[in-house]
Amino acid sequence: MSKIQYLKKYLVISLIAFGLLGCSSPSVKQYAQETPKLDLSEYFNGTIDAYGIFTDRSGEVKKRFTVLLVAKWSVVNGKKTGILDESFEYSDGTKQKRIWTLVETAPGKYTGTADDVIGEAIGESAGNALNWAYTLALPVDNSIYHVQFDDWMYLVSPKVMINKAQMSKFGINLGEVTLSFYKR
């Protein structure tokens, strides 16, 4: 292999590696010192109102929606377990219901299940942030698509949380869901 071929090969591999690094998410641990500290079972307890939008990958708003969330936590088999009952109402008049079961598996570590979540959502919190990773069965027209979510929540005050979730399929960005939660 000539020196020029070697350099070209090295350059291509380096560009691919740097490109992949640019696609990675931040670590939730980088928020460990941020306040107010998020206690999932404290924030998601009681009634919460949320307002959100879905934007496609170009940034155009495709859907607006509101969510009424009623949550309650208890101890089941020695673990904190939360039931989050979400009622969605979209700007086109359609309605949707999702009931999450969240389990704190260790301090700052969570799993979540819901009827339209494929397998389990895996969550980790630190400081004021929480990151969820999960696959959702998303109905579009007459089809169901399994899409991946990289879901970030940030507690900005004791009653307000901001949520941004990147939605992708096969690693291709499809859009973003943005929500603001207001605890009553």
What function would you assign to each model-found segment?
Residues 2-11:
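Bacterial N-terminal signal peptides that target proteins for export
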Residues 29, 73-74, 90, 151, ...:
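Sequence-level preference for short, compositionally simple segments enriched
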Residues 61-68, 144-149, 173-177:
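Amphipathic hydrophobic-ligand
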Residues 51, 56-140:
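Central antiparallel beta-sheet cores of small beta-barrel/beta-sandwich binding domains
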Residues 24-27:
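Bacterial signal peptide processing site
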Residues 19-22:
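C-terminal motif of bacterial Sec signal peptides marking the signal peptidase cleavage site
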Residues 31-47:
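N-terminal helix-cap/turn-to-beta initiation motif at the start of protein domains
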Residues 150-184:
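Glycine-rich, aromatic-bearing surface loops/beta-hairpins
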